[in-house]
Amino acid sequence: MKTINDINFKGKRALIRVDFNVPLDKSFNVTDDNRIRATIPTLKKILDDGGSCILMSHLGRPKEGPEDKYSLKHTIKTTEQLLGRPVQFANDCIGEEATTKAANLKPGEVLLLENLRFYKQEEKGDVAFAEKLSKLGDIYVNDAFGTAHRAHASTTIVAQFFKEKAAGFVMAAEVDNAKKVLENAEKPFVAIMGGAKISDKILIIEKLLDKVNHLIIGGGMSYTFFKALGGNVGKSLVEEDKLDLAKELIQKAKAKGVELHLPIDSVIADKFDANANTEVAMNTSIKDGWMGLDIGPQAVEVFSKVIENSKTILWNGPMGVFEMEKFANGTKKVAEAVVKATSKGAFSLIGGGDSAAAVAQLGFSEKVSYVSTGGGALLEYFEGKTLPGVAALD
């Protein structure tokens, strides 16, 4: 895969798919600028070469055409602050204003196009729409790993209209780090899987059983495993239709010599509430009417030990309902163990979504090896699927 380091952008207009799908508050201020911040080095390389940048992205999920709350103009102030130069805006992505402003762009200038998803054609992967986008630039750059698993017009289809195309620094780093874990993991290798549902993680767990030495299961999905083993899990979250599958995964882990670590105990609550009454209980005997909302102290101890003795760590999904203070300890302690292992030379990849949010919230983003920006894209990559956005750059 070619990266932007292989290209000189002098006098060229780069059409760049970025991921500016960032959260906004009620006054339309960006509340988390990580995705914008991540792509700044890509933009700087192109501008320093003497090129210009045309940025395209989606924001949110607009239903019926343009909606002000989903306008990318709300990201301009943040982008200008981080980039240290003015950013022009086109109130469309394929209309007359976009075409004129792109054509008049001088070296060193930046133009941001309006939200791609204001057009239904974007998510449909419409070829004519992609061709119109392609007319705006000379070279195509994709720096949006978070949407690489979608064959949309701007992430995949548009690439066919360019002789020169390349991955930006974010895209290249994402693919390199995922490859490192998938193909060249130093042993012992532990995968930590959390989150609510087994159904979201079946494929990745099956793939990882061929790669890892240890598999840690936490979060809501662990109760489906305990119920499958005949335990009493009270009214903890259980996917009744996945009990056989959970048993099957336990057997597969055994057959492949993978040590499967389920949480021994839980912090249980009498209701799903930040102010609920809580106790610690063994996971095989949770009281009727109570539910497990975090891993317990014994589980923390076992998990931490496994993590701290590992050389490669992949973490995807929290250990409990970490948005609520009473149920955040498990996720926090696992994060601390990952940081400790990393400081001793382990390679740690944090897989997007909630795990990335938890690591950021704890101030640990710089203390792990890599935090992925792509939740769904990373999962699909580890499931062994081809990512259309990555394939389009080859």
Say what each PLM segment does.
Residues 1-394:
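Active-site loop-to-helix "anion-binding N-cap" substructures in soluble metabolic enzymes
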